[in-house]
UniProtKB/Swiss-Prot annotation:
Stated name of the protein: Exportin-6
InterPro entries: ARM-like, ARM-type_fold, Exportin-1/Importin-b-like, XPO6
Cellular component annotations (GO), alphabetically ordered: cytoplasm; nucleus
Family, similarity comment: Belongs to the exportin family.
Upper lineage: Eukaryota, Amoebozoa, Evosea, Eumycetozoa, Dictyostelia
Subcellular location: Nucleus; Cytoplasm
Gene Ontology molecular-function annotations: nuclear export signal receptor activity
Length: 1047
């Protein structure tokens, strides 16, 4: 074929490729992909693309040509002649070194884009895998000569990085044995490579940097200190690119080279020098971060740790000099990386340095203190706070493990840190920063809690303040006490005075930030309330003063309706209630103490009476729901945590009037307040020597619960309720939903006291049958069905013994009967979220029932399996439904608790469904079910049972797991799958090695007989788990590799 023909082919290829890449919505895209793959497979395509590389300047043609050569290199490099190999390599190297704009003197007009340059380097490195194995020294000598040549230096450095990536690849494009050999050889030669790169950095540094000044009078260290000069540099564009390329290459090696091989003084010296450069220190920091992040620390590392510490200390000294003005001279990205560096250093190595007298940790913390509070960006400040949190966790754990007080050498410094940290969350000290933080848009944090940026900032800071308090409780509380006595009390005095003078609080500017600060201080003391319990006797006077003031402030806020002054005042009132609630554990301890001291009970009772008299009026004054919710939760905590001795008596008036109070309230508030009253009646004092007062509590409870359920019990008696479609009326639907929500909340909070549960069950017994009857009536109303199922799930969970077996069986049978046919299809059709929620709740109920010990619910087993496997499973098996996870938990629970009661056909059906799902790509469900299998194997010897089920299963599960590993669809779970296979194999290693492998490999038509023989012979018959796992890893890699080269 002459050049004209080849040029025409190149143009045709260019046209096809541009259609493929430039028109992503092209309907012929799949067809074009097939054409391109067919062209790749042609025997002459390899020769053609080498012509295109020389004569075409179209980036798509060049990329395609390189991909063809890459295929040949990875799949059939040894099948072409040595001369052809040399020619191809020479062509690629020529393009790579001379036609990619490698240096500023290049005359190439059309410099190739970076993605093609990277591809070139990768293909050249892939070819190098064949050469390196036979003569690594010669190969590296050629590469280093490219590095040392000024005109090609950057390409040589890029190639060293490509070599690291290619020779240590996890891709299954080379055999496992070759991977191991390549990595071993590259590891042996890595000191040469790293030294070449270090020399490059040194040369660039000498050419472009000069000394600015040297630190004097830094701490005297006990080992040779590294260079702490500060340098300035003037790197041109070419030098910058070279420097970046070297650091990128170093990072590539640092990710896998053991730390012991990196402990080279010349490496650390040059990294430290670059660290002290004005503008080029970020890459050096990234390299140091990679080094200190390694957890496997070799002997001799401590001296290098000392050198690193000295650099951190020196750099911190620089940054915090001139009263923090110097920090503005550093690039924000550098400061971010440097903070990360300190964080990693503290996380991984604090235990090594904290007890070493050569490390002046207090002085270091002093610099870190300044560095933290000089930060100007909230995100940067919180990064520093995370470092302090790590350090405090270390001290707390050390103190707890050793049973000793925390080190006194940190006391003063940490108390000062605590004080300064508190200032950072108060507007009076930090107005500018706090005002910039978003306090409107909420985001879900790492704990699943929705909060604004401002709330997150304050909460994280308070948590660190609390850790200091945990370390030094008495001194910390003494340190923080004035915040409350001065700021909070004076604020309320000022607010009260302003109201008396008729000042309009909504527009009063002096209160704008004071309200927010007081809210924050209240939040802080609420968080610290547990420390008043820990040091109860020592801090009683201060805690009692705070509690009394909280009551006074709460009374003021209720009487003055302060929530009407604006949203900040509403938040303040909520925080007041939350802070008092935080003191419920302190109240519990207070109550326990006064019971042993004659004459002090009346004072305690007076506090409780006052608290109740303050809270109750809120429910009668149409306050915002957020405040009512907090008030209701406070009453619940009072009843369930504080458990005052005379609470039942003190709440008598509220109990008697509760229905009048609750009538105008929303169902959400009723479902908080009613359970609080329920617990007040049902929960006696915890002291066993005190009267439980059941003779008074039971008569009180009956009218209480009837007052809630009476309107609900009347519903079935309504004339023509069903026939006349009266049940469809919105008022009746809302009545059903309200009562079910309230009663469900009451059941959920029932005390773990048999007598209490009995009283509750007696009170709602007539409600149960009515509720079950309504399930059939409201079958077309998913929102009602969901409420009913939620009710029964909670009922079975908390009142299982009281409800009894007969009613439980009747209820479950009703559910399965009603939801087992067309209703199930309707609920799950078209992504009906409420319908899905209903079925999920049903699955959870069935799971709970199945998990109950004994044979009480054995009669439900058959219908549960039938519903699950014949009706529900076909609808969700091949979907991504959220029901799949709870569904398979139900199946696991059936096997776990009722294997012996299950028929063989049922077991087979369940195991087949597991096997089917294992073949799918759902990573989370795969892991869940694999864990289920491991638990079943531990308890029931599942794998032994499966292996004995021939010909139903035989080795099909092992084959399936092998196929999953080969497909790479569950690569994140590879180790767990191999463990499972080992457990199967260990039942009969002879059968596994002699029968399974033969059968498995015979079925794999994509491999040649020779390849199958290699796979089998490489898998030794060793039965210890480590060797087995290694063999499995090699088998899966090589199977995939053979499939790849055969494709």
């Amino acid at each position: 074929m002459n050049n004209n023909d080849m040029d025409q082919k190149a143009k045709e290829l260019q046209n096809v490729l541009e259609q493929f890449y430039l028109t992503t919505d092209n309907p012929k895209r799949k067809e074009i992909d097939t054409i391109l793959n067919n062209y790749k497979a042609q025997s002459d395509s390899y020769e053609h693309v080498q012509y295109y590389l020389v004569h075409s300047d179209n980036q798509y043609v060049i990329w395609f040509s390189l991909s063809v050569i890459e295929d040949k290199v990875n799949k059939a490099w040894n099948s072409i002649s040595a001369s052809s190999q040399t020619q191809t390599k020479g062509l690629l190297l020529d393009i790579y070194l001379n036609k990619t704009g490698a240096n500023s003197n290049s005359t190439v007009k059309n410099v190739l884009p970076q993605f093609i340059i990277s591809k070139l380097g990768q293909v050249i490195a892939d070819i190098g895998r064949y050469e390196f194995e036979s003569n690594p020294q010669s190969y590296l000598l050629n590469i280093t000569s490219i590095v040392r040549n000024p005109s090609t230096s950057i390409r040589g450095i890029n190639l060293l990085q490509c070599i690291s990536d290619s020779f240590t690849t996890n891709k299954k494009v080379i055999s496992q044995q070759k991977k191991t050999t390549l990595k071993k050889l590259l590891h042996q030669n890595s000191p040469i490579i790293i030294q070449v790169l270090v020399d490059c950095l040194g040369q660039l540094f000498d050419q472009n940097a000069e000394k600015k000044f040297k630190h004097a009078n830094l701490l005297a260290f006990h080992v040779g200190s590294p260079d702490t000069n500060t340098y300035t540099a003037s790197f041109n564009a070419e030098s910058k690119n070279l420097t970046k390329a070297v650091f990128d290459a170093l990072l590539s090696y640092f990710t896998w080279v053991p730390l012991s091989d990196l402990l080279v003084p010349s490496l650390f010296d040059i990294l430290f020098k670059y660290l002290r450069l004005d503008k080029n220190s970020i890459p050096a920091l990234e390299c140091l971060n990679e080094i200190v992040s390694k957890n496997l620390v070799p002997k001799g590392f401590e001296s290098f740790l000392m050198r690193i510490f000295h650099q951190v200390y020196s750099l911190l000294t620089d940054i915090v000099s001139n009263g923090g003005q110097q920090i503005n001279q550093y690039h924000p990205e550098f400061l971010n990386k440097f903070t990360q560096f300190i964080q990693i250093f503290i996380n991984n190595h604090l235990g090594r340095i904290e007890t070493n007298p050569n490390f002046p940790i207090p002085d270091f913390l002093g610099l870190l203190f300044q560095y933290s509070f000089f930060q100007t960006q909230p995100e940067s400040f919180l990064q520093c706070i995370d470092i302090w949190s790590t350090f405090l966790d270390y001290l707390i754990n050390l103190s707890q493990e050793n049973g000793t007080p925390p080190p006194s050498k940190y006391t003063d410094g940490l108390l000062l840190f605590q004080s300064e940290l508190v200032k950072r969350i108060l507007y009076i000290f930090n107005n500018n920063t706090l005002s910039e933080l978003d306090d409107e848009d909420k985001e879900i944090n790492e704990n699943g809690i929705s909060e604004t940026q401002l709330e997150s900032y304050i909460k994280k800071s308070i948590e660190v303040v609390a850790k200091v308090t945990e370390l030094y409780p008495e001194k910390s509380l003494e340190n923080l006490y004035p915040l409350f006595t001065q700021n909070v009390t004076s604020f309320f005095c000022k607010a009260e005075e302003s109201i008396k003078q008729g000042v309009s609080m909504e527009n009063e500017q002096q209160f704008q930030y004071l309200v927010k600060d007081v809210t924050t201080i209240l939040h802080l003391f609420g968080r610290l309330a547990d420390q008043f319990v820990v040091s109860f006797a020592q801090t009683f006077t201060a805690a009692n003063f705070i509690f009394q003031k909280l009551l006074d402030m709460c009374l003021f806020s209720v009487n003055q309706y302060i929530y009407k002054f604006g949203s900040d005042w509403e938040k303040l009132q909520i925080e007041l209630l939350c802070t008092i609630r935080s003191f419920c554990f302190w109240l519990a301890e207070y109550g326990n103490q006064v019971r042993a001291i004659v004459g002090q009970q009346p004072d305690f009772d007076s506090n409780i009476t006052k608290l109740i008299s303050i809270i109750v009026p809120l429910f009668e004054r149409n306050a915002p729901e957020s405040i009512l919710s907090s008030a209701g939760k406070l009453l619940m905590s009072l009843a369930t945590i504080s458990k005052p001795l005379n609470l039942f008596t003190q709440m008598d008036m509220l109990i008697s009037n509760i229905h009048n109070i609750c009538a105008p309230l929303s169902p959400s508030i009723q479902s908080i307040l009613y359970p609080a009253i329920s617990c007040t009646i049902l929960l006696p004092p915890s002291n066993v020597n005190l009267s439980q007062q059941w003779d008074q509590r039971r008569p009180k409870y009956s009218p209480f619960i009837k007052g809630i359920t009476a309107s609900f019990l009347e519903i079935p008696q309504i004339p023509n309720f069903v026939e006349g479609k009266i049940f469809c009326k919105e008022e009746l639907i809302q009545r059903v939903l309200r009562v079910l929500k309230v009663v469900t909340a009451i059941i959920r909070t029932v005390p773990e006291v048999t007598q209490a549960k009995s009283i509750l069950h007696d009170g709602i017994q007539d409600t149960l049958k009515v509720t079950l009857g309504l399930f059939r009536v409201y079958i077309s109303y998913p929102i009602v069905l969901e409420a009913i199922l939620d009710f029964f799930f909670v009922l079975f969970e908390f009142l299982k013994a009281q409800v009894g077996v007969v009613f439980t069986q009747q209820t479950i049978s009703t559910f399965l009967d009603i939801l087992g046919g067309d209703n199930l299809n309707q609920l799950l059709s078209s992504g009906n979220d409420t319908g899905i929620s209903i079925i999920k709740k049903l699955i959870e109920i069935l799971t709970f029932i199945v998990q109950q010990p004994g044979n009480s619910f054995e009669s439900l087993l058959g219908s549960t399996i039938e519903f699950s496997m014949e009706k529900l499973y076909p609808m969700i098996a091949n979907t991504s439904s959220v029901l799949r996870s709870p569904f398979f938990t139900l199946l696991y629970s059936i096997l776990d608790n009722h294997w012996k009661q299950c028929q063989q056909i049922q077991i087979n059906s369940i195991l087949t469904s597991f096997q089917s799902i294992f073949k799918q790509n759902d990573v989370n469900l795969f892991k869940q079910n694999l864990d289920h299998f491991e638990k079943l194997n531990s308890k029931l010897k599942l794998y032994e049972k499966i292996s004995s089920m021939e010909p139903v299963f035989g080795c099909s599960f092992i084959s399936m797991f092998f196929d999953v590993l080969i497909s790479d669809t569950q690569s994140v779970h590879t180790d767990d799958i191999i463990v499972t296979i080992y457990r199967f194999a260990s039942l009969n290693f002879d059968k596994f090695f002699n029968e399974f492998f033969t059968t498995f490999l015979v079925q794999k038509n994509q491999l040649s007989n020779e390849q199958k023989q290699i796979l089998r012979s490489n898998f030794s018959n060793a039965i210890d788990q480590p060797t087995f796992s290694t063999n499995m890893t090699q088998f899966i890699n090589d199977f995939s590799y053979f499939s790849f080269i055969n494709s």
